[in-house]
Structures are given as C-alpha cells and as structure tokens.
C-alpha cells in the first residue's frame, strides 16, 4: 500500500509541475506582449479578479486566501483518501497544478492572467490553459467514477 501511495504521489507531483510550468510559461508569453486575432479566437490579456465568469470578484484580495485554504483543505482530504488519490493521481495533479498556478497569478499580478477569447457566433468568457486543465481533470475524474460505478453495478448483478 505504501509503495502504491508513493508512486501515486510521484505521478501527482509530475503532472502538477508539468501543468503548473506550462501554464506559467504561456502566461509569461502573454504578459510579454504576445497577441493574436482571428474570426473565432483572440489572444488578449485580461486580469480576472474573480473566479469562473468573474464570480466572487467582490471579495477582491481576500479571494486568494480563500482559494489557498480550499486547495490545502482538499489536499489534506485527498491524503486521507488513499484509494481515491491513487486512482486519480493524474487528474488531481492537473487540477491542483492549474489551481495553484491561478492562485499564484493573484499574488503576483493582482488577478488571474486570462487570455483566450472565443467569440465565434457568441461571446464566451475569457479563460486560460489552467482553466482548461481544471475542466479536463474534473471531467476525466467524473467519467472514470461513472464508468467505475457502472462496472461495479454489473459485477454485483
């Protein structure tokens, strides 16, 4: 059991640092002036003071501390749920790497560095690579849980 947990922690850390590093590298390019415009997608610089769709922006500077508490609380919870952590180390690495990267932005830049603006046919919220990785990580985790439950139900029947 300890070996599996150690392996899962290494996988988690590898994915965490990969996602964190890629996200910060992209944001660095955006902060240095990289821009792109097209009929569908623009790359622009926006500092998001809230969370998804700028929600909770009224919390201003306090939001980053709330997010740190949330991240630490979830990490402590996961360390106590060894089986869950072992089965989803990659997904949790994606979510935590992206989440920590966005929180770092709040401390360094005063808001999350967002830059992808999709506007073909309708306006969509401006987002970043970390946001996508959080969505993908949570989506894969939910799909794996759903199919695992389906498999368990067939075994019981």
Curated annotation (Swiss-Prot):
Name of the protein in its database record: Lipoprotein signal peptidase
Gene Ontology terms: cellular component: plasma membrane
GO molecular function, a single term: endopeptidase activity
Catalytic class of the enzyme: hydrolase
Keyword match Transmembrane helix: yes
Membership in a protein family: Belongs to the peptidase A8 family.
Catalysed transformations (reactions): Release of signal peptides from bacterial membrane prolipoproteins. Hydrolyzes -Xaa-Yaa-Zaa-|-(S,diacylglyceryl)Cys-, in which Xaa is hydrophobic (preferably Leu), and Yaa (Ala or Ser) and Zaa (Gly or Ala) have small, neutral side chains
Highest taxon listed in the record's lineage: Bacteria
Organism listed in the record: Helicobacter pylori (strain ATCC 700392 / 26695) (Campylobacter pylori)
NCBIfam families reported in the protein's UniProt record: lspA (TIGR00077)
Active-site residues, Swiss-Prot/TrEMBL: 114, 131
């Amino acid at each position: 059991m300890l070996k599996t947990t150690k392996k899962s922690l290494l996988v988690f850390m590898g994915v965490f640092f990969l996602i964190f590093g890629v996200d910060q590298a992209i944001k660095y390019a955006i902060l240095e002036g990289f821009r792109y415009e097209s009929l569908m997608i623009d790359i622009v610089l926006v500092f998001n003071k809230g969370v998804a769709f700028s929600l909770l922006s009224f919390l201003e500077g306090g939001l980053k501390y709330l997010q740190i508490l949330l991240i630490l609380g979830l990490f402590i919870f996961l360390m106590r749920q060894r089986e869950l952590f072992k089965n989803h180390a990659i997904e949790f690495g994606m979510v935590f790497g992206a989440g920590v990267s966005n929180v770092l932005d709040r401390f360094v830049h005063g808001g999350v560095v967002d830059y992808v603006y999709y506007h073909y046919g309708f306006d969509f919220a401006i987002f970043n690579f970390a946001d996508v990785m959080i969505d993908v990580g949570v989506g894969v985790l939910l799909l794996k849980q759903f199919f695992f439950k389906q498999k368990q139900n067939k075994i019981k029947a």
